């Protein structure tokens, strides 16, 4: 059972005005009028987020609060609505989608965030920066953690009901501090929550609200020791000095901010895993491109460097493949010049890590996938009569399969790869099932994907979802 921290009754959704008056009475908001007029109340943000962790007492007045967290410990974030339920009538859906991120607070690190996170991924293979503790969370639906975004999780929730998400931060602040003599001061992070509502197409892309707070993450129990140290330091100060600092609050109020610019993945719009549809003739590529009728592909960042590439082309290739820091160094190099360089040359010029990465990128060396499966859409397989398949000898009589390469071996990755293969949005695939004995449909879990036999063949069958806005996929054993 979820334990709710001791809080005043103004956390109740129907006493939102009283709750906001207490929030605005905090020292960092002293410049604001504590009493809310009806006009101001109408302009209140629709949502409020509260991190159930104490703020540091060593923060001066009018400065942003700072909260200490323990690595790997579950912390509750309460998702609250400020206004009356009638104010949510403009929402065209019962649910909203929230994305929680852990990002850098310092602007300097924000500019190099991608490189910083890639370095962390390299040093901590298989780990995530941010996780959601699903068993402790309440009132959230369809929680997701994308394998490509280690610092973000997302889920659906109903603003009209009580909801709490418990998060775990697995990186510590000193992991991004240059190591010199030990005891370096850790860098601050931010916990940011961006919430979206559905647009006319049923996609959660219309921004509703964003808020964030400043945190520092310590090794287990380190946050408690730091909080105690700050409290003891404040107790030694004079009463006049204490007036310059904020008191420590039991919870942390996330303050409004601009939305995070990167929204790379859309959540599934169907929260229920059940289905009651029947097999139908709708194809995955309906209204979109299929593998037999591909759309024109856009250039991607993993393209190969050609010997005929000019100096300008080589510069663009370096940018696309995340070698921008070496563009000035290779300002006069053409594609042929770069291709002539050996591995030792690049390691000596760029350093071991970037040199090896640049050499592999130049030579077009791809990492062998952990698993390969082959899929064929049922409509494609049945397009030619069976007798023609047996008697014919031309390629037109063959069932064409397409290779899917899996790295993470998760259901989410499988859905994304199938959606990409048939040029549809991943949100249109609600569930994936595998046809078992006697024709039963077994939900495909991460464990099942991990136990697929390498180079297995599947025929994809589709079932219309009960909400009529997507499909369920059934994997049948192929030929």
Curated annotation (Swiss-Prot):
Q: Can the keyword Glycoprotein be found in this entry's annotation?
A: no
Biased composition (Basic and acidic residues) is annotated at 221-245
Q: Does the keyword Ribosomal protein apply?
A: no
GO BP terms, alphabetized: cell morphogenesis; cytoplasm organization; determination of adult lifespan; epithelial cell maturation; negative regulation of transcription by RNA polymerase II; positive regulation of growth; regulation of transcription by RNA polymerase II; salivary gland development
Region called Disordered, residue ranges: 219-245, 271-301
- Could you tell me which Gene3D superfamilies the record lists for this protein? Transcription Factor, Ets-1 (1.10.150.50)
Q: Which portions of the sequence form the region SAM2-like domain?
A: 261-365
Task: State the superkingdom.
Answer: Eukaryota
- The protein's predominant localisation is nucleus
Q: Compositional bias of type Polar residues: which residue ranges?
A: 271-281
Task: List the expressing tissues.
Answer: Highly expressed in placental JEG-3 cells and very low levels of expression in non-steroidogenic cells. No expression was seen in adrenal NCI-H295A cells or in adrenal tissue.
The entry's keywords:
DNA-binding, Nucleus, Transcription, Transcription regulation
**What are the Grh/CP2 DB domain coordinates in residue numbering?**
43-280
An example molecular function term from Gene Ontology annotations:
RNA polymerase II cis-regulatory region sequence-specific DNA binding
Entry comment, domain topic: The Grh/CP2 DB domain is required for direct DNA-binding. The Grh/CP2 DB domain is essential to maintain the undifferentiated state of embryonic stem cells.
Q: How does it assemble?
A: Forms homohexamers via its SAM-like domain. Interacts with MTA1; which is indispensable for TFCP2l1-mediated self-renewal-promoting effect and endoderm-inhibiting action.
In terms of PANTHER family, this protein maps to: TRANSCRIPTION FACTOR CP2, TRANSCRIPTION FACTOR CP2-LIKE PROTEIN 1
Family, according to the entry, reads as follows: Belongs to the grh/CP2 family. CP2 subfamily.
What is this protein called in UniProt? Transcription factor CP2-like protein 1
What is the source species?
Answer: Homo sapiens (Human)
Its encoding gene is what? TFCP2L1
């Amino acid at each position: 059972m979820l334990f709710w921290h001791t809080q005043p009754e103004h956390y109740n959704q129907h006493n939102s005005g009283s709750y906001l008056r207490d929030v605005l009475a905090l020292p960092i908001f002293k410049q604001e009028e504590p009493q809310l007029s009806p006009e101001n109340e109408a302009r209140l943000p629709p949502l409020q987020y509260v991190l159930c962790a104490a703020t540091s007492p060593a923060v001066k007045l009018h400065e942003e609060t700072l909260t200490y967290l323990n690595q790997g410990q579950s912390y509750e974030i309460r998702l609250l609505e400020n206004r009356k339920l009638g104010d949510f009538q403009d929402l065209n859906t019962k649910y909203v989608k929230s994305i929680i991120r852990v990002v850098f607070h310092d602007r300097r690190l924000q500019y190099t965030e991608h490189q910083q996170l890639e370095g962390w991924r390299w040093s901590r293979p298989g780990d995530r920066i941010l996780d959601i503790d699903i068993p402790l969370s309440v009132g959230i639906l369809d929680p997701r953690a994308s394998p490509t975004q280690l610092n973000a999780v997302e889920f659906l929730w109903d603003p009209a009901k009580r909801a709490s998400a418990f998060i775990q931060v697995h990186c510590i602040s000193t992991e991004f501090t240059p190591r010199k003599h030990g005891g370096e001061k850790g860098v601050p992070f931010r916990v940011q929550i961006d919430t979206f509502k559905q647009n006319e197409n049923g996609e959660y892309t219309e921004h509703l609200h964003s808020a964030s707070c400043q945190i520092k993450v310590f090794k287990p129990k380190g946050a408690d020791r730091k909080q105690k140290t700050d409290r003891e330091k404040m107790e030694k100060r004079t009463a006049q000095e204490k007036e310059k600092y904020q008191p420590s609050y039991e919870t942390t109020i996330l303050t409004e901010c601009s939305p995070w610019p990167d929204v790379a993945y859309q959540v599934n719009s169907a929260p229920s895993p059940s289905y009651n549809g029947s097999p139908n003739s709708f194809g995955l590529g309906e209204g979109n491109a299929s593998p037999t009728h591909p759309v024109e592909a856009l250039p991607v960042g993993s393209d190969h460097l050609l010997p005929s590439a000019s100096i300008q082309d080589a510069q663009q290739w370096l940018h696309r493949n995340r070698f921008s820091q070496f563009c000035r160094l290779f300002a006069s190099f053409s594609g042929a010049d770069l291709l002539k360089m050996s591995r030792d040359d690049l390691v000596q010029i760029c350093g071991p890590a970037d040199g090896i990465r640049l050499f592999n990128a130049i030579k077009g060396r791809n990492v062998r996938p952990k698993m390969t499966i082959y899929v064929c859409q049922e409509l494609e397989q049945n397009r030619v009569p069976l007798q023609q398949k047996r008697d014919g000898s031309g390629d037109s009589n063959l069932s064409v399969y397409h290779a899917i390469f899996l790295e993470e071996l998760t259901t989410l990755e499988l859905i994304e790869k199938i959606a990409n293969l048939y040029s549809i949005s991943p949100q249109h695939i609600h569930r994936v099932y595998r046809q078992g004995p006697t024709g039963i449909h077994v939900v495909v879990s991460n464990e099942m994907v991990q136990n697929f036999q390498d180079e297995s063949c599947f025929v994809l069958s589709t079932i219309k979802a009960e909400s009529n806005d997507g499909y369920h996929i059934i994997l049948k054993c192929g030929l």
